Each structure stands twice: as structure tokens, then as C-alpha cells.
């Protein structure tokens, strides 16, 4: 599901919500979540899952084209862990 599909589904499910308002709400939620991760905060949405940052240490990688060794710097990457309720719902549905 894309962001625009999510906005369309919200507008369809809640007729009192104009598509423009649904668009604004989704953008504000995603912006708030992004800002929290940039600050290093953990985001927990009960029943859905949590977002946190994982540290990836520096390593030596390989250029797949030439095979030469390449230094890959350390970095922080966003990580999502599905909550128990979400895992169970997906498992039952599939």
C-alpha cells in the first residue's frame, strides 16, 4: 500500500473526512514519526509495532562489479519490529 492509497482508503472509510484532510493527517503523522527517529527516540504503537534505530558498525564490503574491497562507513538505520497482535493477525489471515 502506498501513501496515496492509504489516504484514499481513509477518505473512503470516513466520509466526513475530506481527502485533503486525510492527506494532511497522514503527512503530519509521518513527519512526527520521522522527527522522533531523527532525535533518536523510539516509537511504540501498541498492537502494531515499534520503530527504533539500529547501529550498523563500519565494515569492509565488495564492489559487485569489480570485486574490489570497499570501506562501508558506520551508520544508523531505522528498524521496525511488528507487535504481537499484528503478527498474530497476519499469521491468521495468510
From Swiss-Prot:
Source organism, top-level taxon: Bacteria
SUPFAM superfamilies (UniProt xref): IHF-like DNA-binding proteins
CDD domains reported in the protein's UniProt record: IHF_B
Alphabetized Pfam families for the sequence: Bac_DNA_binding
GO biological process terms held by the UniProt record: DNA recombination; regulation of DNA-templated transcription; regulation of translation
Keywords attached to this entry: DNA recombination, DNA-binding, Transcription, Transcription regulation, Translation regulation
InterPro entries: Hist_DNA-bd, IHF-like_DNA-bd_dom_sf, IHF_beta
Record-level GO cellular component terms: chromosome; cytosol
Molecular function per GO: DNA binding; structural constituent of chromatin
Function, in words: This protein is one of the two subunits of integration host factor, a specific DNA-binding protein that functions in genetic recombination as well as in transcriptional and translational control.
Assembly behavior: Heterodimer of an alpha and a beta chain.
Similarity comment text for this entry: Belongs to the bacterial histone-like protein family.
Protein name: Integration host factor subunit beta
The organism of origin for this protein: Dechloromonas aromatica (strain RCB)
Amino acid at each position: 500500500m502506498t501513501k496515496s492509497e492509504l489516504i484514499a482508503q481513509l477518505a473512503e472509510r470516513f466520509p466526513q473526512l475530506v481527502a485533503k484532510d486525510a492527506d494532511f493527517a497522514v503527512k503530519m503523522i509521518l513527519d512526527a514519526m520521522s522527527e522522533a527517529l531523527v532525535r533518536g527516540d523510539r516509537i511504540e504503537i501498541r498492537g502494531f509495532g515499534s520503530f527504533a534505530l539500529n547501529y550498523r558498525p563500519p565494515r569492509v564490503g565488495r564492489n559487485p562489479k569489480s570485486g574490489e574491497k570497499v570501506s562501508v562507513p558506520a551508520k544508523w538505520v531505522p528498524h521496525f519490529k511488528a507487535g504481537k497482535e499484528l503478527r498474530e493477525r497476519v499469521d491468521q489471515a495468510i
